[in-house]
């Protein structure tokens, strides 16, 4: 089963829609998790129909401040037996019945980007961990690094936020599944001495999923952070 996790940074422009459409044709994902869509429910519903998804849950963007920010969506094909459990502006949690006797859990997670609010991401992740015990893969963008070697650039990364992230992953028994492809998944687009690039961690899984997700493959691309993975 192929799945796609993409921080699209607004789906309102045709370039982003074209990239997503091309990925659909190339990778044929059964599940898609989108972050920072900056779209409302009706706009994502149209996209869902255009891409021939039958199921979907949309968390609309926030327009309370006069612009658009945030917005999540999880879309899935008709043969995927997916059941939404909970959702918020920072997550969509679901159970998939691939095998009725052995369901597994997938969570699309989008961490708070603001440094002053990142502790809320870890409170949410701990809460999700406490809700149930089963094979679990958590995809998305945590907006944090695990170590300083996941960043290159002139601005040094503070240690304490990375430690807080490592601590919450340990508490939730979530392990980084690694990747194939380029090491860095984001850059600030600035020239020369101001250039910064980072590897924002991809999917993680619980210990219970170590055998269930054996053979999972990852491709991480630098262009508009996206992660494509296959559950074998």
What is each model feature region?
Residues 1-232:
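A shared catalytic/ligand-binding motif for oxyanion handling
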């Amino acid at each position: 089963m192929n799945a796609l996790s993409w921080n699209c940074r607004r789906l309102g422009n045709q370039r982003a829609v074209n990239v997503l459409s091309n990925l659909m044709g190339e990778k044929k994902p059964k599940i898609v998790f989108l972050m920072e869509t900056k779209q409302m429910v009706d706009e994502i519903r149209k996209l869902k129909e255009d891409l021939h998804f039958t199921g979907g849950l949309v968390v609309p963007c926030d327009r309370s401040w006069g612009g658009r920010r945030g917005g999540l969506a999880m879309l899935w094909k008709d043969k995927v037996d997916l059941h939404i459990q909970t959702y918020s502006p920072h997550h969509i949690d679901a159970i998939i019945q691939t095998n009725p006797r052995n369901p597994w859990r997938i969570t699309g997670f989008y961490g708070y980007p603001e440094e002053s609010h990142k502790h809320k991401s870890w409170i949410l992740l701990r809460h999700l961990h406490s809700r149930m015990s089963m094979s679990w893969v958590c995809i998305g963008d945590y907006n944090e690094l695990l170590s300083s070697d996941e960043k290159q650039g002139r601005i040094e990364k503070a240690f304490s936020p990375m430690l807080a992230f490592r601590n919450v992953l340990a508490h939730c028994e979530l392990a980084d599944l690694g990747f194939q492809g380029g090491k860095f998944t984001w850059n600030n687009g600035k020239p020369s001495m101001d250039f910064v690039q980072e590897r924002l961690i991809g999917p993680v899984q619980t210990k219970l999923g170590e055998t269930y997700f054996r053979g999972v493959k990852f491709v991480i691309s630098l262009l508009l952070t996206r992660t494509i993975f296959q559950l074998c």
